[in-house]
């Protein structure tokens, strides 16, 4: 073994890259260690030959967190890691997004990246280490790759400014959580959530990260120079310009006309006809190109046609200019039995969004490397195939659905009330019923509307917009509210969500180099204009949260008892609290400080549970009259129950003003009587009287 080790300073952290000791049969393998806190093994394997049956680049990224890394044994019956968690899926996407555009066009060999967290102190997120390791492993592998890339996480505090690669503790106090990745001269990916920061503050964070991760890129270059394998002898296929020119001459004008059809289904039908005609004319005969080659070139003609039209100032596919948002149609309260609902339609994109309120027990239990925790807010995004007029697989959420759901969640989360103000668990589900671009941002708008319809006290309404970019040479056009085709054919997908005051989420994916600060400023400015436009239309339908929760939502009552009384409410083995829940049909959560939250499907159920708890925790008050039940009769008096678990003694002399020979002459067991509390001694024994009740009532007790 001859391991090569490269150590460098990255902000306040010391990063070590090591190769040549572990996973030597992989095409590229790097062990990344950050401050002895996090260690990630990253491997890259590339197939030497492309699969001719695949018409796409088969890149897969797998990020996995091993529980042994944090000194834990997995839960469950099998005691081993299972399917990827949501965190692992999101991090896999985070790594995939900046590296995918850096593989050369036409490269179709399968590439698999596996990032394994093997050690962590649970102080920082291992995702940045995994991204650095991916860059290094690709750089030394010899696989055609236009990297390396750098990556960094940025936090922000109003008083201290930007902070590079913060710990979990520092992130908790930050108003920004942003991950940025890119090359030495370009930003390729941004993923962030914020607490209403300005556009300038968000752009500043992107530029700060880009400057800081240059140290990563330089270190990876030095590692590759010392330990890199020879670059693969791969060349892209020679473009068939003769065939391209022939098809464009025959069909170019018709394709351009096809892209003036504003209805998506009609446009696709017309372009499909033209594609079939091109295949029939230019393939099929001996010596002619294959049908797949003709289709590929036809797709290239579509790509160039749309882009040239846009940068030359012609109307977009649906006739809009570059800054216009598609027509909106907004409804709330569309589903009568749900807690909150909204139907948000923007052009041919539509989301049916539903908000549901639950108890603290409904919170999502997360088993992470940092330990178990509960998440009281969930946002789930569903993208069924019918939303784009297709048949397709139905089943669990895929990577795309998980990623879009997380972006929508990030967008609205900062505007949710604090748990001590609104202690409900909240689940929002966005059902995409139509899709033609930016369904995730439709989910943001719909989620904000549904939450306000449910009566969740949002700090402010939230809206989102997707921006696009087409850049040809020195010409460029920034597009507001992109269609699906514009997303596919453009150079940038730039999604911004926020309130009227500031940005709450920013996601950016760039497919080309050369996105300047000027272009990002223009995109953020146009996004702000569009966001304010959408918020204005949303506010006309529902401008603030409803003052009362939906009648269908559970009723919540908060109360507090003395900590000494917690044991009484819970009872032996939980018997008392179980009995209350079963009899009242309410759910009860008790904290160690005596705070109690009661959730009932109806107000009556919650009130009944509250009264039961008050009865258990109440103390007998001297001088107060109670209606009690005779529990036991003895020679010297009777024991009467006046509160749950609290009996007092009525001495025989306190039964009546007249002389009483036998207690049973006055009382019988099970009888209800009014009693006056005379005294409670230091041992908690209660002295009662029946004969003094009348006098006490007369005196106004």
UniProtKB/Swiss-Prot annotation:
Its cofactor is Mg(2+). Residues 623-691 form the S1 motif domain. GO terms for cellular component: cytosol. Mg(2+) binds at residues 487, 493. One of its GO terms (molecular function) is RNA binding. InterPro entries: ExoRNase_PH_dom1, ExoRNase_PH_dom2, ExoRNase_PH_dom2_sf, KH_dom, KH_dom_type_1, KH_dom_type_1_sf, NA-bd_OB-fold, PNPase. It catalyses: RNA(n+1) + phosphate = RNA(n) + a ribonucleoside 5'-diphosphate. PROSITE patterns: KH_TYPE_1, S1. It is found in: Cytoplasm. SMART domains: KH (SM00322), S1 (SM00316). Keywords: Cytoplasm, Magnesium, Metal-binding, Nucleotidyltransferase, RNA-binding, Transferase. Its EC number is 2.7.7.8. Residues 554-613 form the KH domain. One of its GO terms (biological process) is mRNA catabolic process. Belongs to the polyribonucleotide nucleotidyltransferase family. Involved in mRNA degradation. Catalyzes the phosphorolysis of single-stranded polyribonucleotides processively in the 3'- to 5'-direction. HAMAP family: PNPase. Component of the RNA degradosome, which is a multiprotein complex involved in RNA processing and mRNA degradation. This is Polyribonucleotide nucleotidyltransferase.
